[in-house]
Amino acid sequence: MAVCIAVIAKENYPLYIRSTPTENKLKFHYMVHTSLDVVDEKISAMGKALVDQRELYLGLLYPTEDYKMFRKLHNSYTDVMCNPFYNPGDRIQSRAFDNMVTSMMIQVC
């Protein structure tokens, strides 16, 4: 069940965060930012010392049965990136992307 979907920029900040309407909305935003900190720690550790490459593996980031959901999200994200009026690195404000994410969250919940 997807309760929060986030798109993260290459520079490690969120471009888009959407969560289901719950009383714990702030909790999901906090979890996204905390996850970014973990990724950042792994990346910075790689540059400081000789680190075992297996330690950098973050694990499977989505359940295998939800690959269709991931593919749909990726295709919609690609559409946003291909928009000539979108500046890479800006927050995603596309209504089509937002509607697609909302429909995914409704289907899953």
From Swiss-Prot:
Keyword Endoplasmic reticulum: yes
Role of this protein: May play a role in vesicular transport from endoplasmic reticulum to Golgi.
Primary residence: cytoplasm
Lineage: Eukaryota, Metazoa, Chordata, Craniata, Vertebrata
Family, as annotated: Belongs to the TRAPP small subunits family. Sedlin subfamily.
Keyword Transport among record annotations: yes
Subcellular location: Cytoplasm, Perinuclear region; Endoplasmic reticulum; Golgi apparatus
InterPro entries xrefs: Longin-like_dom_sf, Sedlin, TRAPPC2L
Species this chain originates from: Pongo abelii
Name used for this protein in its record: Trafficking protein particle complex subunit 2-like protein
Cellular component terms (Gene Ontology): endoplasmic reticulum; Golgi apparatus; perinuclear region of cytoplasm
A biological process from GO: endoplasmic reticulum to Golgi vesicle-mediated transport
Assembly, per entry: Component of the multisubunit TRAPP (transport protein particle) complex, which includes at least TRAPPC2, TRAPPC2L, TRAPPC3, TRAPPC3L, TRAPPC4, TRAPPC5, TRAPPC8, TRAPPC9, TRAPPC10, TRAPPC11 and TRAPPC12. Interacts with the heterodimer TRAPPC3-TRAPPC6A.
Keyword set, alphabetical order: Cytoplasm, Endoplasmic reticulum, ER-Golgi transport, Golgi apparatus, Transport
Annotated TM spans: none
